[in-house]
């Protein structure tokens, strides 16, 4: 399928065929394709939980208010954010960045580029992503507003702003996963209606992660898609300047 065909094929499917199982390895491959999605500063602060155990799926369905999509799902994938891992991920990104500079940059420019990478990932990232009862976010906000009086600067740096950044990055991975599933001939239904505490309990998730999306997966039944696709007029959403 072309990209346009994949996009048109992807729908939020509410009812899956119980007679058509999914190949778990294909679903796993679609999750691996999701790792190709871009994330802010390449920190990749998300994880995916691929659930095939029927007992756990029943618990997840209950946590998702027993919607038909989860009750009829063949498998369920849960995407979560892991903002608390920013230090470990920044360290890994920095290490690879330094090695890449050594491999591909001219010798006379390596020191300067390594210093720049180190400043960003070892100093700036920890400062931007650190949390402490909203206080660090307030400090960053005040600094940003002050600097912004003299030059352009990113102003969305509060703790709640950074939480949004992490969820946006995870959302890009979720969309990539759904499109990969569509290409494979599988269907999904992105859910935001769930009891996050019950989802975390069912998956034994650490307290500091957050649920971004629950995606029941399967192959659609004829009644699985509710109605024709509706989109607002393109002219209302497109602005050319």
Task: Tell where the protein language model's regions lie, with residue ranges.
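Acidic, surface-exposed loops and disordered segments
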Residues: 1-241
